[in-house]
């Protein structure tokens, strides 16, 4: 190896070693946001996320078991949520799909899904029937939180959104 290659390696190596020293850590969320997170009027019988965490919601990142624990507890406390475990992660953690709506819509979820499936092929339904189904359906939004295992902010945000939707 010649001197030029050795110098290049030395520079790269010293930069990597010092990069941690040069990077300033970010502030905690309490320093960034003046408004309180989850500051609505909530149903008392539904536990606040802080009940499942060992810190205040928003101060730190919740771990997967805390999120699962909250979801499963909320499914017992509220008739506005249905939890379906659809798979396991590569670490054998449960993966959930949640349906959140009014109690009536949750109890009629199978019919709602059937009506949506009727709309999936325009060749098999006439306009009058399609319009009738559309008029009867609730608004539907698909919200996917964290499709990559190392993206924690989405799953953490889901905790607050779920609570807000079922408890407010």
Located regions from the model:
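Bacterial N-terminal signal peptides that target proteins for export
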Residues: 1-7
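M14 metallocarboxypeptidase catalytic domain recognition
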Residues: 6, 19-168
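Bacterial N-terminal signal peptides
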Residues: 8-16
């Amino acid at each position: 190896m010649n001197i030029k290659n050795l110098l290049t390696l030395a520079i790269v190596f010293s930069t990597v070693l010092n990069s941690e020293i040069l990077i300033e850590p970010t502030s905690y969320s309490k320093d960034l946001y003046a408004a309180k997170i989850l500051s609505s009027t909530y149903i008392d019988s539904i536990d606040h996320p802080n009940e499942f965490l060992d810190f205040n919601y928003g101060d730190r990142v919740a771990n997967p078991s805390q999120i699962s624990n909250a979801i499963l507890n909320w499914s017992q406390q509220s008739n506005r949520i249905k939890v379906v475990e659809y798979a396991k992660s590569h670490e054998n953690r449960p993966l959930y799909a949640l349906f959140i709506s009014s109690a009536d819509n949750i109890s009629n979820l199978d019919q709602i899904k059937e009506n949506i499936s009727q709309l999936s092929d325009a060749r098999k339904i006439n306009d009058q029937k399609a319009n009738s189904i559309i008029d009867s359906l609730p608004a539907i939004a698909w919200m996917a939180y964290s499709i990559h295992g190392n993206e924690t902010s989405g799953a953490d945000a889901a905790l607050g959104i779920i609570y807000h939707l079922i408890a407010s």
